[in-house]
Amino acid sequence: MRTSAPPAGDHALVQIVDAALADATRRSGPWLVCRPECAQCCMGVFSISQLDAVRLQQGLDDLQRHDSQRAAALRKRALEAVTRLSPAFPGDPKTGILADDDHAEQLFADFANDEPCPVLDPATGTCDLYSARPITCRAFGPPVRSEDGLGVCELCFHGATDEQIAACEMEVDPDEIESKLLKEMQDAGGPSGRTIVAFAVAD
């Protein structure tokens, strides 16, 4: 099920996350080596929310309006990815929704770790839907805390101490706006469950 547009609050969420990224980037200084064409974080499948999926779909619609050739190439990459990934997809390959049981989560941990994101343009090494990218992508690079502790990109913070890394921590969504927007979408009859980028932009 495709929703026409993200809820109104998504724009504010993106602004908050992007501001947090800018602040963490400033504090990180030269330890943060992210740059255009550094696409290591674009390799390997990761889960996204339905809010991310709708934002990507809107971004693809916008791309279609001003560069239909790039949009068609992106859709082709996504369809090819769905074809490759569907046989072992730990969820429903018809809907693209990931299963949320423990066994499926274990399977997903080792699923398609070498698969390039279909939104990544292989010719330029840059994201074709950068302004519409998922929250995970917006928070990659600076230190971000999860249940496993404080994680950083393996290419960044070489030589930094634990204290220096902690001082650059990025708080992604402290007010849990994303969770509220997802509930709003579900209450309005939108899909629930997590998916992956390829399924989000293949239709």
Residue ranges of model-derived segments:
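Short loop/turn segments that flank or connect secondary-structure elements
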Residues: 1-203
